[in-house]
């Protein structure tokens, strides 16, 4: 009979996409996969599109909620644990994988109550609160970066297979001249500071660059017009084929979510990171993984002005060899076997 895995991951692409990569790896080995998520977050649409059945529990975050919600929280968590327990009893998985998001908390507790091994994977350089709690009851804890947990195995972040299959950067970059292709990513929501600053700089860079700018939903206004006027860029709300976009790019300007950092390493690209200003400096610490190795440059959000960006870009645009060096260093930090390693640990720990 096929072994069964229940995947708990939700809320953002940073949790869901790495979990899908692990699910794919286990499906290749004959495992049956089911997902635990919430109806109002992205996994509800995304996971079924990948052919994986999904079950739902009711749970939401408490950050920024009023006192009433905090008082009701224990009851909401208890209810969610009972819902997850019922799903686990019916499905009878051999292991449960927690990849982050609100759903992991009740799901992990329910798995422990049912005697099912819990394996955790932390994608960020700073562990999320749910994973900190669950690490105390998990059979194994894995992490993408060495800073989240003191004694957990570092495996990297599972990324899409097509990125690892891109040619080495020194081969991709060998015959390229000008313009320098700059991929700008504002994220699915769009990062206002990136969307405002980069088009201003495009006006001053002329034909030395061509910019492909992903602005996020509803953010084309103003950006598109600037690129039409400058003639050195295009803007779109979303990019459908990320592997093709990474293959085309010579340089990336973006936020430094954990998945983005690991995708850029897998593709082998130099980057300028503008970390989102989390209280725990999560994105900044993610970015240092590549910046400390000479593969990326970090510009803090408060410093990300047109003039600062221009000062950073001009020497890079003038020196293709430098871009290639940074790209090679980025590829050296990639973890192409992350999904396989997480799958191996699940197989080892399954009951």
From Swiss-Prot:
From which organism does this entry originate? Actinobacillus pleuropneumoniae serotype 5b (strain L20)
Q: List the subcellular locations.
A: Cell inner membrane
Which InterPro entries would you find in this protein's record?
GlcNAc_MurG, Glyco_trans_28_C, GlycoTrans_28_N
Task: Report the GO molecular function annotations.
Answer: UDP-N-acetyl-D-glucosamine:N-acetylmuramoyl-L-alanyl-D-glutamyl-meso-2,6-diaminopimelyl-D-alanyl-D-alanine-diphosphoundecaprenol 4-beta-N-acetylglucosaminlytransferase activity; undecaprenyldiphospho-muramoylpentapeptide beta-N-acetylglucosaminyltransferase activity
Protein name as catalogued: UDP-N-acetylglucosamine--N-acetylmuramyl-(pentapeptide) pyrophosphoryl-undecaprenol N-acetylglucosamine transferase
Domain of life, per lineage: Bacteria
Q: Which GO terms describe its cellular component?
A: plasma membrane
The way it spans or sits in the membrane comes to:
Peripheral membrane protein
The protein's annotated catalytic reaction(s) are:
di-trans,octa-cis-undecaprenyl diphospho-N-acetyl-alpha-D-muramoyl-L-alanyl-D-glutamyl-meso-2,6-diaminopimeloyl-D-alanyl-D-alanine + UDP-N-acetyl-alpha-D-glucosamine = di-trans,octa-cis-undecaprenyl diphospho-[N-acetyl-alpha-D-glucosaminyl-(1->4)]-N-acetyl-alpha-D-muramoyl-L-alanyl-D-glutamyl-meso-2,6-diaminopimeloyl-D-alanyl-D-alanine + UDP + H(+)
EC number(s) stated in the UniProt entry for this protein: 2.4.1.227
**Tagged with keyword Cell division:** yes
* UniProt binding sites for UDP-N-acetyl-alpha-D-glucosamine: 12-14, 124, 160, 188, 239, 258-263, 283
Biological process annotations from GO: carbohydrate metabolic process; cell division; cell wall organization; lipid glycosylation; peptidoglycan biosynthetic process; regulation of cell shape
**Which keywords describe this protein according to UniProt?**
Cell cycle, Cell division, Cell inner membrane, Cell membrane, Cell shape, Cell wall biogenesis/degradation, Glycosyltransferase, Membrane, Peptidoglycan synthesis, Transferase
Q: Which HAMAP family match?
A: MurG
**Family designation:** Belongs to the glycosyltransferase 28 family. MurG subfamily.
The protein's annotated pathway: Cell wall biogenesis; peptidoglycan biosynthesis
Chief location of this protein? membrane
Known role: Cell wall formation. Catalyzes the transfer of a GlcNAc subunit on undecaprenyl-pyrophosphoryl-MurNAc-pentapeptide (lipid intermediate I) to form undecaprenyl-pyrophosphoryl-MurNAc-(pentapeptide)GlcNAc (lipid intermediate II).
